[in-house]
Amino acid sequence: MIRRLLIPNAAAKSHQYIKVSLFSTSAPEITPPFIHKCKTISQVKLIHQKLLSFGILTLNLTSHLISTYISVGCLSHAVSLLRRFPPSDAGVYHWNSLIRSYGDNGCANKCLYLFGLMHSLSWTPDNYTFPFVFKACGEISSVRCGESAHALSLVTGFISNVFVGNALVAMYSRCRSLSDARKVFDEMSVWDVVSWNSIIESYAKLGKPKVALEMFSRMTNEFGCRPDNITLVNVLPPCASLGTHSLGKQLHCFAVTSEMIQNMFVGNCLVDMYAKCGMMDEANTVFSNMSVKDVVSWNAMVAGYSQIGRFEDAVRLFEKMQEEKIKMDVVTWSAAISGYAQRGLGYEALGVCRQMLSSGIKPNEVTLISVLSGCASVGALMHGKEIHCYAIKYPIDLRKNGHGDENMVINQLIDMYAKCKKVDTARAMFDSLSPKERDVVTWTVMIGGYSQHGDANKALELLSEMFEEDCQTRPNAFTISCALVACASLAALRIGKQIHAYALRNQQNAVPLFVSNCLIDMYAKCGSISDARLVFDNMMAKNEVTWTSLMTGYGMHGYGEEALGIFDEMRRIGFKLDGVTLLVVLYACSHSGMIDQGMEYFNRMKTVFGVSPGPEHYACLVDLLGRAGRLNAALRLIEEMPMEPPPVVWVAFLSCCRIHGKVELGEYAAEKITELASNHDGSYTLLSNLYANAGRWKDVTRIRSLMRHKGVKKRPGCSWVEGIKGTTTFFVGDKTHPHAKEIYQVLLDHMQRIKDIGYVPETGFALHDVDDEEKDDLLFEHSEKLALAYGILTTPQGAAIRITKNLRVCGDCHTAFTYMSRIIDHDIILRDSSRFHHFKNGSCSCKGYW
């Protein structure tokens, strides 16, 4: 069979072809233009065969064959021909074309192989060869190969060429060798705009934004080089990371005047810069005026709204992308998931993640971090475990977050398990990391997990481990804030002061605002409201949390007037008053017996402050009225609530019924609580105590039997006291302490002394059906009394004894402490589950409102 090749005839119309027979006996007239008409590999090969069979393959035709093989993508045949081609300028052009073609196809290693082959065959590269080779070295981050090519460029003299120098700077940058990139740049004899772009990009991408802007300043001010659109794309990200929006605005103006603003990449960088500077209105203006947008444009807007807390706008934009069927990438989905998660909408974040998976987009490390944050926010443990399993099943590095930061995914897993109250699982993951693998975030999330959801003592133990010599990580501001939460929980004033001192020593500037807020909260909850006020007064900047924290502290300590003074000052300065602030005001009034003021603030909430009262506000007002004995008014308030009263309101009412011994009203409140939350342990305990105080022991037995039947467990009461050597905890009748004998003897002696001056045991608080003598013995062994005796034994003369109880202080113990403060040389500061009691010289700061 005769095989013919059809090649388009340039001289004829486009549909006419020249026929070339494979077995023709006469030599065809094959010219360079004829060869270049070949469009397929088979056509070029057939021409090649004809030239070989007739022996007419000249160097000129070989050169054109090589060029055509490259153009049709048959690079291997081009290399074969070039190996036998004698060195020449035309041949160097072909080597360059081959190296570039392999580079364009992502075959960097093949580029370097060809470069080595070229050199071994005694070919001399030119100023076009080196940029292609340097680009290949950069793509595979091979500094060694790059240095070899660099040396050859020095030998051949091409290093002085500006294009070669620019490519060399870019290569060292891609290999993360900034010092070499800067050295090459400084040694260049001439710089063009590409040179400046290369060095600015190097600093910008390798985490040196400040130096990048300094180089840009030199480029424009010192050397007068006019920026192009690539310059803007390289300079705007450093502006974003440093928050230098003033320079960003200048670049924006330059982009407008130089007509670069229509460049999509410049527009994207401007949107990103404004978004990261929190200037979303400006970002939206640029975004809206962009004639061409891609997914990067939308991503910058969605991420920007999420970062500044405008989650509704972020979600709205994400939904608009879905409506307009814009193809979203993993960055878009991750930003949307983050927006939902940071709003506390964890289940919505999980829903978006499912949509992402169903659309065929695989999550990356950033996505997992956002989803796990959403799970943590709503306590979705099972979903969190599913994400954990996904991360293990698919090739996702738990120790990377996609931006080079170590441990971000595993840190988020630890945080998720801790916030879902699986602190042991979180600790197991923490322990699975070697000491060298743990970064400061790892320590912080574990300490935070113990502080808020586990064991505050273990949180402080972990903090202590961070200060050991072999630990390479030191606490940062976030670690300190988590540790202060633990101190506040334990009322560990001594340790809190040590942490405060560490923060002052190790902060380069002022203590961060959020740490100062935690210090105010810690000192207030540790019973030192004067130290809390001192921190407040020394703060350079304050926010709503600062003022509210101090106001809460005053309320806890019964200083209602001072709390309202803080509130009035907040109003004068112009802070926005929200529901939380007004709740603290009502709380302070309740714990100070300020009934009229509390009622006035409650009645003015909506009309003056624009805040609708919620269930918590009603509960606080019920507590205010109930503590004052106005139980009928409190009940009317509950019945007139515009919403269904939740358990918290009825519990407040029941607590007041117990204080005033109103059994029937207490039973009514308990019934309401049972209807709404049948396993609420506090309501059963309050009702049982109410019956006990009324001497209705059969009802006490019935309630306790009901609690056992429903599996409701009463928390055991315990008290702890802070001493020189640490914190010591006592339970009722506790005799496990090594110095129990001395503790009981001190207590016995002091109880006898206060009886001599008028103290009479209030046996109604002994919640057991026994005779009065046994009740006296039961009251004697209460945990807060044992803690006080230990404090008397161990506290230096004149220093305050600080006691914390996990439940409400017993009425008899409160009376006993009042008498004790008359006969001992110590102030007694007692914190119970409700408030602080400062006992001094026979009186208590609560004034009976507890």
UniProtKB/Swiss-Prot annotation:
Spans annotated as Type DYW motif: 756-850
GO biological process, one term: RNA modification
SUPFAM superfamilies: TPR-like
Region (Type E motif): 649-724
Pfam families the record matches: DYW_deaminase, E_motif, Eplus_motif, PPR, PPR_2
Source organism superkingdom: Eukaryota
Each PPR repeat, start to end: 58-88, 91-125, 126-160, 161-191, 192-227, 228-262, 263-293, 294-328, 329-363, 364-398, 406-436, 439-473, 476-510, 512-542, 543-577, 578-608, 614-644
Entry's Gene Ontology molecular function annotations: RNA binding; zinc ion binding
Keywords assigned by UniProt, alphabetized: Repeat
Region (Type E(+) motif): 725-755
UniProt xrefs under InterPro entries: DYW_dom (IPR032867), E_motif (IPR046848), Eplus_motif (IPR046849), Pentatricopeptide_rpt (IPR002885), PPR_At4g14850-like_plant (IPR046960), TPR-like_helical_dom_sf (IPR011990)
NCBIfam families named in the record: PPR (TIGR00756)
Membership in a protein family: Belongs to the PPR family. PCMP-H subfamily.
Name of protein: Pentatricopeptide repeat-containing protein At5g16860
Organism: Arabidopsis thaliana
Species classification: Eukaryota, Viridiplantae, Streptophyta, Embryophyta, Tracheophyta
Gene behind the chain: PCMP-H92
